[in-house]
Amino acid sequence: MLLDFLSGKHREPAECIIKVDGEEIAHLYPFLTEVHVECSRGDAWSGTLRFESRRDENGVWSVQDDPAIRPWKPIVIEAAFGTTVEEIVRGYIREVVADYPEDPGATTVTVELQDDSIAMDREHVRKAWGNEVPTTDAAILLDILSKYPLSPDPENGAGLDGLTVNQNATDIRFLRARAEANGYELILDRGLLYFGPMRLEADAQETILVYAGRDTHCFRFDVRADGHQPDAVGYDVAPETGSEPVHQDVQPDVPSLGTEPADSVDSGLSPFIWRLDRPGSVSAAELDAYARGRANELSMRVRAQGELDGSLYGHVLRVGLPVGVDGIGTTMQGIYYVDSVTHVFSVDGYRESFTLLRNAYGDNLEGGTSVLAGVL
C-alpha cells in the first residue's frame, strides 16, 4: 500500500475480478491477456475477454473446454482497489470465439459479453399497453421489469401518463423507444434500470486531477466547445382553429454545470433553433417531451475526452453521473457529466478512457477554489 502524503489517500494497484455463475474464474487468470469493457449512456454495455489457451496431454484446452466459458452464462466484472471492490458491468456471455492458427501455441479464445439488456432482447412481444385503461410509462416499466432479475432505480422519472401505446418489439427495444419518447436516458447498472432525465444534480464522483503533481491520475485530457449546436428545439402543432400550424420552441431545462452558459443567446445573432419533423402518430405531450430531451442533449456543447490511470484514481468512473475536473484552467474546469467510459485491464494496468459533457463554462467545483491551487 502506498500513501499519498499530499492527499492522505491510499493507492493500490487495481485488480480485475471476473465471476461467472457467481464463482470467480481465478483458475483462468493465468491465461487472461486483456479485459475491455465499453460503457455508454446510449448503447448496451459490452465487453471482451481475451485469453491465450493451451492443450494438455489429454487434448483438453484450458479455456474453451472450461464449462464456465459458455454463451448465456451470467458474468460480472469488478475492479478491486485494495479491500474496496466496485462493479464495472454485469450481464451474460454473448459469444465465444476460439482461434486455432497454424502455430498451436498461439491459440486464443475471445469471450464477448453484454450487459443485462441482452436477456431482455430474446422475445419479440406484441402487446397493446393501456388498451382498456390508459396507463403510464412508470407502470409499463414495472410490469416489464417483473420478468427479469432487475430492479427499477429509485431515482427513475415518472414518464408520460394517459398512454395507449403498442409494443411490437423486444422488451429492451421497446423501453429504449419509450425513453427516447420521454427525452430520457435508459441505463442498466449494478442490477438497476435507470429510466429518467440526465442526473446532473447527483453527487459528483471523485474529482479527475490533471497536472496535479504526484496526485495526477489523468494523463491525457482534451476539451472542445462546439458553438454550432442550437439553443432551442422547435416543432409545429396543429392549430385549434384555422389551418396554419403553431410553432413551439423548447428550451433546455437541465441545471447548469458551470457559472457561464455555453450557449449563443447573447451573441447578437439571430435565434439558433432547429425544428423537428412531427411523426403523425405522436401525441403533443410526447413530442414536447422528445423535443425537450433533444434540447437538453444539444445544450451539452462542451465535450472532453481523456484517460485515467484507474489504479491511481481508485474508483470505477460511472456513466450517467457528474464528475469534477480540476487542473485545466478556470474556464474549462468544473463539473462535467460522464457520457461514456472504456475500461481496459492489460499489462499496462487499469486504464479508463472517458468522454465527458458540459453545458457551461466556469469553475464550479465545491468550495470555488481549485484543489490544485499552489501546485505547479
Predicted regions, residues:
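Short beta-strand-centered interaction patches in the first periplasmic/extracellular domains
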Residues: 2-4, 106-111, 115-117, 154-224
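An acidic/polar, Gly/Ser/Thr-rich interaction patch typically located in mid-to-C-terminal regions
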Residues: 37, 41-64, 216-376
